[in-house]
């Protein structure tokens, strides 16, 4: 996959017929895309050819749709390709799509597309055995009347399996425009002596600017949280302006994460800033407007146009409890007033900046529908739907895919996974227990290793890339730079606290860049 650029508007035209690059005009035809043509299970399905361990590829009953599917399985180790070449194509970009699933053992199953300029590949993500996922891969054809080869590949240990169904080849390019990292803890880390190093595989472990390291590995955006009056003097508007300037110098776009609190805000805690504690609803509305405008203008003063601003953080339960809560008691009209004030402030500061509304539990479609049905009924404007998705808390990829696809279709808004992470180890590097530190918390197929961390992020990006009509923007890896630095703990009122997150950062316990960072290069 090709690297895209996150500049100007945070939303670049994406994929599938509306790509920023010219889409091919030809409508390709895949023969026997659902493996139904033979009417029974066969060794070699009509329209497809095999190579490698040919006995490991066959069709059988149990399709994602229809009756049959392509399956790869063998009692011994195997490597097999089942492919089809589509000819007579015009020059341009093409995207292959397939529904797939695989076992969780040693099993490199993938969808490949070769249009003559090299093989592009998307791996089949790990999911429960009964869960099909749709994945996509794009490649460019550089000559008229050319051809593209769709390849369904498996290299696996004996007994491991993969299934494929409903193959498509369509004109256009499915490329993510946001490959981001939350670096909210970075400034405080640096102030307390934190250092960051390139990975030893390619850069000899040189000490460098963390933002430059991220950008060199393919990241094109950062996310910065903003508290109103934090106890430790970090994560405030002044720091936002400084980090925004540094991000611009490093070639990174900026997403502003407004918490509307003096400390952490999430579904369970949406505490008003102390200075706003006794405000009326009218005063809170004005305070939201003023704070949002001030945050945005602080960046503009540094020559930075924020690509996106999110109004609140994980606001399933609302903001500014209890006045803006969605339950106990529900105050949807008040919440709508606050969000409308924030939206107005962003657009006054920068009309092209996108406004995001962000919920937790990215695979919970019922909650997302309930929340956005209520907020749209109140007439709240917004541009992007953001979702937190941590696989160990929020479940497998299937519900995430269903929810992202549904949000894009139901509300006509682009979607982004705005928080995600996974551990590279179960060890710890300070005196604070880690948020994820037990083997029982891990997901089968994603070990707590550098490779498991990278595979987890890769597969989440694949799900966002597959959102139809280019409506999936990308993802931000949460607090990628939060290594264990004394003084940079989770509690802004307690300098002795640890961070509980160092085993999920994008830098290891020696502050070296981890392989997960390479997933920024699609």
State where each predicted segment sits:
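Extracellular carbohydrate recognition and processing domains
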Residues: 116-146
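Aromatic-lined substrate-binding rim segments of carbohydrate-active enzymes
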Residues: 206-265, 273, 329-352, 400-410
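Active-site cleft segment of glycoside hydrolase catalytic domains centered on the general acid/base Glu
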Residues: 236-239, 266-382, 395-404, 490-499, ...
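Extra-cytoplasmic beta-strand recognition segments
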Residues: 35, 80-107, 135-139, 167, ...
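Aromatic-rich peripheral "rim/lid" segments of glycoside hydrolase catalytic domains that contact
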Residues: 191-192, 406, 425-459, 463, ...
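Extracellular glycan-recognition surfaces and repeat-rich motifs
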Residues: 36-76, 209
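Glycoside hydrolase catalytic-domain groove-lining segments
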Residues: 354, 365-443, 451-452, 458-466, ...
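Extracellular carbohydrate-recognition regions
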Residues: 25-50, 173-183
